[in-house]
A protein has these predicted regions:
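Internal anion-binding site segments
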Residues: 85-157
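Donor/substrate-binding cores of folate-linked one-carbon enzymes
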Residues: 1-101, 111
Length: 157
């Protein structure tokens, strides 16, 4: 089994916390699932979620995912060892209308390159919030060959 930082099948792949903010989701979560040959497409054991607020950053959701992943393992370890746990094929979620998306690192990273033309677009601030973390390069505006980094609140706590 694997803990995945994203609600499956909607958020397969990487940087799901960042994409949840950019996509203006109201919830973000993690999934305990079986490993299969495809990326994050194994049967689901359990999903845990938390609210995404207008103030949530990528770092906030990353920290929440660490806590939730621990809870998933803690809450399911006995049933996993006994073979009595849930095992729900992701296709059941898809058949009930859940989206099935796969996020790739490079596609997500490209979203952090902002322009001043779009500064009043609500997505602009969501991108800034999503990439506000010490774990990767923040969102930026290019001026010539220089990058001006845009932060939301990282470093103020």
């Amino acid at each position: 089994v694997n803990t995945h930082g994203g609600v499956l099948p909607e958020y397969r792949g990487s940087y799901c916390n960042i994409n949840a903010i950019i996509n203006n989701e109201t919830e973000y979560g993690v999934t305990l699932h079986y490993i299969q040959p495809g990326v994050d497409d194994g049967d689901i054991v359990e999903i845990k979620t938390v609210p995404v607020t207008d103030d949530s950053t990528g770092l906030d959701l990353y920290k929440e995912s660490e806590r939730l992943c621990y809870e998933l393992v803690r809450d399911n370890i006995d049933s996993l060892l006994q073979g009595t746990n849930n095992r729900i094929p992701q296709q059941q979620f898809i058949d009930r209308g859940h989206a099935c998306n796969s996020y790739k690192r490079n596609d997500t990273v490209e979203k952090k390159d902002l322009t001043l033309v779009d500064i009043n677009n609500p997505v602009w601030l969501r991108v800034v919030r999503a990439f506000d973390s010490p774990y990767h390069e923040p969102a930026y505006i290019k001026v010539g060959d220089k990058k001006i980094y845009v932060r939301y609140r990282y470093g103020t706590e």
